[in-house]
């Protein structure tokens, strides 16, 4: 298995698909990296030689990926929450941020329904 940016890339996949195993790299960026490195996207990872892998590592190194990207995202959300702005408050409450309705739906963000509390008399 090839190791790029601390991630094992599956051998049986094409280079374009294999690079998407790295957090922060999707299909488009993967294709751009392959073009910049001069590697065919249809080439299987197991067929890449050491020179190709080194070029790919160099190109991937130009982007913020994996732990650094996760850390940056977390810090951005934390900053919003510390500011107390609308988006930060919504993050804190675990509600949708972008104006979606919450009277119904929004189950993914709000979590499973709680049982209705019965009124005692």
UniProtKB/Swiss-Prot annotation:
It comes from the Bacteria. One of its GO terms (cellular component) is cytosol. InterPro entries: Rbsml_uS13_C, Ribosomal_uS13, Ribosomal_uS13-like_H2TH, Ribosomal_uS13_bac-type, Ribosomal_uS13_CS. One of its GO terms (molecular function) is rRNA binding. Residues 94-121 are annotated as: Disordered. One of its GO terms (biological process) is translation. Coiled coil: none annotated. PROSITE patterns: RIBOSOMAL_S13_1, RIBOSOMAL_S13_2. Keywords: Ribonucleoprotein, Ribosomal protein, RNA-binding, rRNA-binding, tRNA-binding. Located at the top of the head of the 30S subunit, it contacts several helices of the 16S rRNA. In the 70S ribosome it contacts the 23S rRNA (bridge B1a) and protein L5 of the 50S subunit (bridge B1b), connecting the 2 subunits; these bridges are implicated in subunit movement. Contacts the tRNAs in the A and P-sites. Belongs to the universal ribosomal protein uS13 family. Part of the 30S ribosomal subunit. Forms a loose heterodimer with protein S19. Forms two bridges to the 50S subunit in the 70S ribosome. HAMAP family: Ribosomal_uS13. This is Small ribosomal subunit protein uS13.
């Amino acid at each position: 298995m090839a190791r790029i940016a601390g991630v094992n890339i599956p051998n049986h996949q094409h280079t374009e698909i294999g690079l998407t195993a790295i957090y922060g790299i999707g299909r488009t960026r993967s294709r751009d990296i392959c073009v910049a490195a001069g590697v065919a996207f249809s080439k299987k990872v197991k067929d890449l030689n050491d020179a190709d892998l080194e070029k790919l590592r160099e190109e991937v190194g130009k982007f913020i990926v994996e732990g650094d990207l996760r850390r940056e995202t977390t810090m951005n959300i934390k900053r919003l929450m510390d500011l107390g702005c609308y988006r930060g408050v919504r993050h804190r409450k675990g509600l949708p941020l972008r104006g979606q309705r919450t009277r119904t739906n929004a189950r993914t963000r709000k979590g499973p329904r709680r049982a209705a509390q019965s009124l005692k008399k």
